Design a protein with these regions (language model features):
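Glycine-rich adenosine-cofactor-binding loop
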Residues: 2-21
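Nucleotide donor/acceptor-binding cores
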Residues: 3, 63, 182
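Short internal beta-strands
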Residues: 29-34
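Phosphate-bearing ligand-interacting subdomains
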Residues: 37-98
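Structural signal for interior beta-strand "rungs" in well-ordered beta-sheet cores
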Residues: 92-203, 207-210
């Protein structure tokens, strides 16, 4: 059925993402786990149909999938495997999110949760995840597979590179920074006042480098 969707990744966020899918008028047809340990079980009433390998060995052409895992590198690889086999990974935007008509959001795998705001001339790349109440200000670009935790605020004119992690309630201040590097991690509640290089963790107010990753 065209409005059926299958969720990949079973865990504590399964019901949250199932509700997002349903809010976007999809019917959750089942779940797939990374291995066979839970095949045949249910999670919050949804059947666990098999492992990722089971899925890859089946006919998935034209079917819809939602990727719920938190590890963005794994998500990126799974996405490639699904698309290569004809799977579809639609972008899902909660109906009460506020999206500027001038924003540019990838049609592949973006998840925009309730009460988010994406302002004019912002760009959101493939596979990005915006948890509830994230704000992305104007003229900011999220490259592919960026994760923004609940209530993260991303100011204007900032470029955030692939697989960066913007922690819950963190603030990236407009006019103070130009970029956040690839795979950088912004700690929860951090206030970012200068550019962040790739592959580091920053935390605190003002945010400073804690360690490399």
């Amino acid at each position: 059925m065209p409005n059926e969707i299958f969720l990949l990744g079973v865990g504590h966020s399964t019901p949250f993402f199932a509700e997002l899918a349903e809010a976007c008028e999809y019917t959750v047809a089942g779940l797939y786990h990374y291995n066979d340990d839970r095949t045949g079980q249910t999670d919050h009433g949804f059947p666990i149909l098999g492992s990722f390998n089971d899925l890859y060995n089946s006919d998935i052409d034209g079917k819809n999938f939602m990727l719920t895992m938190g590890n963005m590198a794994i998500k990126r690889e799974v996405s490639k495997n699904l698309i290569r086999r004809g799977g579809i990974i639609p972008t899902l935007v909660h109906p009460n999110a506020v999206i500027s008509q001038f924003a540019d959001i990838s049609e592949c795998g973006v998840l925009v949760c309730s009460s988010c705001e994406i302002h004019s001339d912002a760009i959101v790349g493939e596979g990005c995840v915006l948890w509830p109440q994230v704000v992305v200000e104007h003229n900011t670009q999220l490259h592919d597979y960026v994760f923004c935790g609940p209530k993260a605020y991303v100011g204007a004119y900032i470029e955030i590179f692939d697989q960066a992690f913007i922690g819950q309630c963190s603030v990236c201040i407009s006019g103070k920074i130009d970029s956040i590097g690839e795979s950088a991690i912004i700690g929860a509640g951090a206030v970012v006042t200068k550019n962040v290089p790739p592959n580091v963790i920053v935390k605190g107010n003002p945010a400073t480098i804690y360690k490399k990753v």
